[in-house]
């Protein structure tokens, strides 16, 4: 009886020690991986769900996002600029990232900083981290499965809810 208790205790304790809790550093490393993505956007005002899919690639100098459906678009983020290329219309637009003032995009580019003054990082449980700006108007949830980032959820400034499922490439 005592042997079973200690064996169970040791198993539980070793599982607890070997568990790899999610953290800001894990989130940052996962945010710099290449992924295919499937996004669902829910517009409550229009009662419509839109979907898109594509691939995202990170290098030291830039982030490349290739939207493959429903419309083919390419986004190139480098320095303080985002270049948007509509493949179907063969039109390119260049925008300053500062003008966009997009919390999600800022986290994607810069990663998260536990000491940031502009937002807080909350570990909700062993699979979800939330990043909340100080105004509480921007909440981004990052969900993990076996320490792999697999879902990002947020609501944009227009009130559209986004869910982005990620699959590592």
Regions found by a protein language model. Give the residues of each.
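Sec-dependent N-terminal signal peptides
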Residues: 5-14
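Short, solvent-exposed coil/turn segments at beta-strand boundaries
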Residues: 31, 57-62, 77-81, 124-126, ...
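Flexible, surface-exposed loop/linker segments and immediately adjacent secondary-structure boundaries
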Residues: 89-129
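Gly/Pro-enriched, hydrophobic low-complexity segments
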Residues: 122-169
